[in-house]
């Protein structure tokens, strides 16, 4: 007689029960697959949604903005919002990522 772990023994018993009593298997209901979403994917999805909304906002503002001077640039800062500056002062508004 072979020594089996309790899991293997349960599998053998289930298989033999199915062979001798096929009606018991027909009545079984299979478990539904549960969807588990990690919080990282939820955060990623919300960040993607916020970035898309921000992108639409910025594009709509840029479409409305027609510069009179070609040296002028419209940039966004968190302190001041949208700021119009020229190319020479553009270095003051560096972005640290």
From Swiss-Prot:
Q: Where is this region: Disordered?
A: 24-45
Which InterPro entries did the record assign? LtuB
What is the protein's given name?
Late transcription unit B protein
Q: Name the source organism.
A: Chlamydia trachomatis serovar D (strain ATCC VR-885 / DSM 19411 / UW-3/Cx)
Task: Tell me the gene name.
Answer: ltuB
């Amino acid at each position: 007689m072979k020594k089996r772990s309790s899991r293997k023994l349960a599998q053998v018993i289930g298989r033999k029960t199915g062979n001798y009593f096929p009606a018991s298997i027909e009545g079984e209901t299979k478990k539904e697959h549960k969807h588990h979403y990690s919080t990282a994917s939820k955060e990623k999805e919300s960040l993607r949604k916020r970035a898309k909304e921000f992108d639409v906002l910025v594009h709509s503002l840029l479409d409305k903005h027609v510069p009179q001077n070609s040296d002028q640039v419209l940039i966004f800062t968190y302190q001041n919002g949208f700021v119009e500056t020229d190319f020479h002062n553009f270095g003051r508004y560096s972005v640290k990522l």
